[in-house]
């Protein structure tokens, strides 16, 4: 122990007061204290130039190498060299002594010299074997927890793999169902198309047969009339005796002859274009439309939510801006459509007149003008409670078997198409504008019509729809 104590004292004598490790290139300053050259140089560079031990000032240029201390460090290292050889892993790399203590603060294995040094002497120490036992137990606990987490991770990996496989299977099954459903729907639509075409052809044949019969009867009457005309003409150019022969009977025949009423009014189609499931498909393109008060004619009254419009009894005192219609009871939707597919529905219940459709944002708003596709309006309308027309040039009469209470409007910008559907009649097609040359933004168009002495006071109301995933928000 005495030898160990002396070695400890010797190591302390060759320990730098700054880094607390054995001297490396030791130097002495004016006051006589020694330090590692690098350590004291860093102190001097910091502007202090004060001895860390006695606080006396010193100059870096006066540093003196301390060869005696350097030799002592080398001698101590040589003494420990033999002990280090062959047992390097269990020996202190600095002092060459056996590592048999554990510093709990620094978490390091120490030799007895390190433990007595100023760097560690105030730290709690335990025997290396005791520390190893304690940390062995802690490591076992940590290892058990990590293995439990590893098992959980492996279990999750298996579950993810199963879920991935199940999901792929589910998607493939759904793909097959979708494909089969659409194949079935396509086949059904083909069959329904053929059925409706056959009904239309049947209507065509029936009406042509009726018209043919009327034409034959008319031909018979025309022939009888021509024969009577010829007889009267012949009598007018014959002798007096021939003219007077049975003249009374002939005159009675001519006076009693009348063209029989054949009722040749235009036939109406009994079949309509009705595509099963069309409403559902159109509503996937549904958009939320609101009315733009800045475009509303001063006589129009908009609801608070801007989803309903009616003609008021008095003209409102509102600014006459450039966007506002001033001559007709018209209003535009607030939305601007530059592309995409868009669909909305309007309730026209109880109305005797209305106009619906789309128009260019740049259409004329002031004075009198014609609603037609030539002037940038793609609309249909009802007037006088029974006359439906499309705003072509000239107008196209529309024949509806079922008066609509709700009208669907579908805009396909890229296809240049605006279509109108009778929602009341299972979504049957009313009319389509096709191959339209759209330029610039389009806007929904509405007119509740004039009141017509109180007969057309019901409002136009935008119907609530579930906004579809394909409906564009490019407003």
From Swiss-Prot:
ZnF RING-type span: 16-55
Family matches, as Pfam families: PRY, SPRY, zf-B_box, zf-C3HC4
Lineage: superkingdom: Eukaryota
The keyword Glycosyltransferase belongs to this UniProt entry's keyword annotation: no
Tissue spec. comment: Isoform 1 and isoform 2 are expressed in fetal and adult heart and fetal lung.
Coiled-coil stretches noted in the UniProt entry, renumbered to this chain: 128-238
Reaction(s) this enzyme catalyzes, per UniProt: S-ubiquitinyl-[E2 ubiquitin-conjugating enzyme]-L-cysteine + [acceptor protein]-L-lysine = [E2 ubiquitin-conjugating enzyme]-L-cysteine + N(6)-ubiquitinyl-[acceptor protein]-L-lysine
Phosphoserine modifications at: 266
Pathway it works in: Protein modification; protein ubiquitination
An example Gene Ontology biological process: protein K63-linked ubiquitination
UniProt zinc finger (B box-type) residues: 92-123
Chief place of localization: cytoplasm
Role according to the record: E3 ubiquitin-protein ligase whose activity is dependent on E2 enzymes, UBE2D1, UBE2D2, UBE2E1 and UBE2E2. Forms a ubiquitin ligase complex in cooperation with the E2 UBE2D2 that is used not only for the ubiquitination of USP4 and IKBKB but also for its self-ubiquitination. Component of cullin-RING-based SCF (SKP1-CUL1-F-box protein) E3 ubiquitin-protein ligase complexes such as SCF(SKP2)-like complexes. A TRIM21-containing SCF(SKP2)-like complex is shown to mediate ubiquitination of CDKN1B ('Thr-187' phosphorylated-form), thereby promoting its degradation by the proteasome.
Domain characteristics, as noted in the entry: The coiled-coil is necessary for the cytoplasmic localization.
Name assigned to this protein: E3 ubiquitin-protein ligase TRIM21
């Amino acid at each position: 122990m005495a030898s160990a104590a002396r070695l400890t004292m010797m190591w302390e004598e060759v320990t730098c007061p700054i880094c607390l490790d054995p001297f490396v290139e030791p130097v002495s300053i004016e006051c006589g204290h020694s330090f590692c050259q690098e350590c004291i140089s860093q102190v001097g560079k910091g502007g202090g130039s004060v001895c860390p031990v006695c606080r006396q000032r010193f100059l870096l240029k006066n540093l003196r190498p301390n060869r005696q201390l350097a030799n002592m460090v080398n001698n101590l290292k040589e003494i420990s060299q033999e002990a280090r050889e062959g047992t390097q892993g269990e020996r202190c790399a600095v002092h060459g002594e056996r590592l048999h203590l554990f510093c709990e603060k620094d978490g390091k294995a120490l030799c007895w010299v390190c433990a007595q040094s100023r760097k560690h002497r105030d730290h709690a120490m335990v025997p290396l074997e005791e520390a190893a036992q304690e940390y062995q137990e802690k490591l076992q606990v940590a290892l058990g927890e990590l293995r439990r987490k590893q098992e959980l991770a492996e279990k999750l990996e298996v579950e993810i793999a199963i879920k991935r496989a199940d999901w792929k299977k589910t998607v493939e099954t759904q793909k097959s169902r979708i494909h089969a459903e659409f194949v079935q729907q396509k086949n059904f639509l083909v069959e329904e198309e053929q059925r409706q075409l056959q009904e239309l052809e049947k209507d065509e044949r029936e009406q042509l047969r009726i018209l043919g019969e009327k034409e034959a009867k008319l031909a018979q009457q025309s022939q009888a009339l021509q024969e009577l005309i010829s007889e009267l003409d012949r009598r007018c150019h014959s002798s007096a005796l021939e003219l007077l022969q049975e003249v009374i009977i002939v005159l009675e025949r001519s006076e009693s002859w009348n063209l029989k009423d054949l009722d040749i009014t235009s036939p109406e189609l009994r079949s309509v274009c009705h595509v099963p499931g069309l409403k559902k498909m159109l509503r996937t393109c549904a958009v939320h439309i609101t009315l733009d008060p800045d475009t509303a004619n001063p006589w129009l009254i908009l609801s608070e939510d801007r989803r309903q419009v009616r003609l008021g009894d008095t003209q409102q005192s509102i600014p006459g801006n450039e966007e506002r219609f001033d001559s007709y009871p018209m209003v535009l939707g607030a939305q601007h459509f530059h592309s995409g597919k868009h669909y909305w529905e309007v309730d026209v219940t109880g109305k005797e007149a209305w106009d619906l459709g789309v128009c260019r944002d740049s259409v004329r708003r002031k004075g009198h003008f014609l609603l037609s596709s030539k002037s940038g309006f793609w609309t249909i309308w009802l007037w006088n409670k029974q006359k439906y027309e499309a705003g072509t040039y000239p107008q196209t009469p529309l024949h509806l078997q079922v008066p609509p209470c709700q009208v669907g409007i579908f805009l396909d910008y890229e296809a240049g198409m605006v279509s109108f559907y009778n929602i009341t009649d299972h979504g049957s097609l009313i009319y389509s504008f096709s191959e339209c040359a759209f330029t610039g933004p389009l806007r929904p168009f509405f007119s509740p019509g004039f009141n017509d002495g109180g007969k057309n006071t019901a409002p136009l109301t935008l119907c609530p729809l579930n906004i579809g995933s394909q409906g564009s928000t490019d407003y």
